[in-house]
Swiss-Prot record:
An annotated GO BP: photosynthesis
Transmembrane intervals: 3-23
Protein name as annotated: Photosystem II reaction center protein T
Oligomer status and interactors: PSII is composed of 1 copy each of membrane proteins PsbA, PsbB, PsbC, PsbD, PsbE, PsbF, PsbH, PsbI, PsbJ, PsbK, PsbL, PsbM, PsbT, PsbY, PsbZ, Psb30/Ycf12, at least 3 peripheral proteins of the oxygen-evolving complex and a large number of cofactors. It forms dimeric complexes.
Organism: Cucumis sativus (Cucumber)
Taxonomic lineage: Eukaryota, Viridiplantae, Streptophyta, Embryophyta, Tracheophyta
Keyword Protein biosynthesis annotated: no
UniProt keyword Transmembrane helix, yes or no: yes
Length: 37
């Protein structure tokens, strides 16, 4: 059952990376909330 472990590790790594990028980028999108103009 090594394939299952490897798949789980791969999915976990991709998930963490995707989560990090997803949480890192959005803050730049909601600019209208600041209303600096």
């Amino acid at each position: 059952m090594e394939a299952l472990v490897y798949t789980f590790l791969l999915v976990s790594t991709l998930g963490i990376i995707f989560f990090a990028i997803f949480f890192r980028e959005p803050p730049k999108v909601p600019v209208p909330t600041k209303k600096a103009k």
